[in-house]
Design a protein with these regions (language model features):
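Extended, low-polarity transmembrane helix blocks
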Residues: 1-25, 32, 41-49, 53, ...
Length: 123
């Protein structure tokens, strides 16, 4: 059963890791996309760091509750900034998907990382 907790952390983290890496290799496109929603360019680097560092910490189960809360807030924020054109079916799906992912992070925030984690080993 404990391995399912690890898999859950990996599954929730994967999309953020991939997106963070994609932003590095497509930095100019990332800036253009963010600016098209009036998000300032200076937020690109912190976004990339957040999308790579926090998921890695979640996967190993270190500072899980803090990472999960930060990622839940980040995920809800991105839903509200980038996915509110509900006339576009894909945007509606992305909005709802972000809310579902944030829900998973909130469950991690409440329950912690479980037995197979650095948090457990250090406690």
């Amino acid at each position: 059963m404990h391995i399912i907790e690890v898999l859950g952390r990996i599954f929730l983290s994967t999309i953020f890791l991939l997106e963070g890496i994609n932003k590095i290799f497509n930095y100019e496109g990332t800036i253009e996309f963010m600016e098209s929603f009036n998000v300032p360019e200076f937020l690109a680097i912190p976004t990339i760091i957040l999308e790579i560092l926090f998921p890695l910490l979640l996967i190993i189960g270190y500072q899980t509750k803090i990472c999960a809360l930060v990622l839940a807030i980040f995920t809800l924020t991105t839903a509200l900034i980038f996915h509110t054109d509900f006339t576009n079916q894909m945007q509606l799906i992305s909005f709802l998907k972000n809310f579902a992912i944030a829900g998973g992070f909130l469950i991690l925030f409440i329950n912690g990382s479980g037995k197979y984690s650095l948090d457990h080993k250090l406690s």
